[in-house]
Amino acid sequence: YGTASLGAAVAIKEQIEKGNLKGTVIFYGTPAEETIFAKVWMVREGVFDKLDVCMDWHPGDTTESGTQSSKALVDFRVSFNGSSSHASSDPWNGRSAVDAMELYTTGLNYYREHILPTSRIHYQFEAAGDVVNVVPDYAKIWTRLRGNSVEHVNDLYDRALDIAKAAAMMTGTTYETKLISGIYEILVNRTGAAIMQDNMETLGDISFSNDEVSYANTILKESGKPQIGLDGKLKPLMPTLPATGGSTDVGDVSQVVPVIRMSATVAAKNGPWHSWAVVA
């Protein structure tokens, strides 16, 4: 990932020094890629303001120019505070923070029926009491909301905050929300994608050795997937596509500078992503 980006930057630098290219190349180290938010802070501090264009790539199981957007998202935490009591001797004196959290997630799950098919709601319990015989006085949950535009994500966020408030009211608890961060969707650069496609066609398909294909099939077999090896064939330039899956803080970069994107095959075809199979 970073190594390939550095290699590309060095190659461009050498061509500039030889007089074959004109311009300036800047290599950015962008940390914490999978936490999504590092580039948000970099954009805020004006790190990319001097650029005419930014080039971004992502490893994948296909080789293609980037023509697809990504999902905007917002991350936030909700904490509920109640009052402890013995769960059997005097539960009537307790106010369960976990009850509030459960009602919050129930509200989110009923809300799913009324959101766009392109929207997503995720959550993870982070604190939910310690022992079973005590009414828990504290609970905390991390929530992530996604949509194909930041405007729609803001609508999801407003509704989720109302659901948290209602959950606290129903249980006689108090609640607090803490915004973690949020990111924009990618603005697809159609002109840049066509230029990237021309250059990728000059290079052609990626070739893999028999040993590499065999290793990929071993990974697929162990993952319970069809053994279809590696796909190094360059895809034709695709139409501009809306987001279908993930999110990236490159979206924020694309709001302030044109971004040209591509992916290259580094993993077995249709293998399970975010797993040790891809790491291997």
What are these regions, as identified by a protein language model?
Residues 1, 90-94, 153:
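Alpha-helix N-cap/helix-initiation motif
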Residues 1, 58, 86, 272-275:
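Histidine-centered active-site/metal-ligand motif
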Residues 1-12:
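Di-metal (Zn2+ and/or Mg2+/Mn2+) metal-binding site signature of metallo-dependent hydrolases
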Residues 2, 36, 186:
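Loop/helix-junction capping segments adjacent to catalytic residues or to phosphate/diphosphate-binding pockets
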Residues 6, 19-136, 146:
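Histidine/acidic-residue-rich, glycine-tolerant segments that coordinate divalent metal ions
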Residues 11-15, 107:
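Active-site catalytic microenvironments for nucleophilic, acid-base chemistry
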Residues 102-280:
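Metal-dependent amide/peptide-bond hydrolase catalytic core
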